Amino acid sequence: MHQELIRELAMITDEERRILEGKQEIDPQLYTEKKEMVVDSAKLLKKGKLIQVRPHTRFVHFPAHTHNYIEVIYMCQGTTTHIVNGNQVVLEQGDLLFLNQNAVQEILPAGEYDIAVN
């Protein structure tokens, strides 16, 4: 992968900055307005868009959740560990993971150089 793109994707996001400053959990309001953890496409997609590519949030455990859309994860560099329907899945550079709306996913903390997009 082109190093300029990797540098761009590796930049610390506002959410990651809060995590690094001591907030040791994700902010559910960034992902859903429901009590149960169903990641809502309306919270992530720009108005009028049907697809959005964003860097995976690193440095924090992402608790078990589902999505109201199909999620595609591409591992650009490093590794990430996912628990999908109770099974451990380790993504390495170049891997793709497709998750339907019924898949229950949990993500273990990723490091600074573990770069994925979803």
Feature locations, PLM:
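Generic protein-terminus/edge-of-domain signal
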Residues: M1-T79
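N-terminal regulatory/effector-sensing and dimerization cores
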Residues: K49-N118
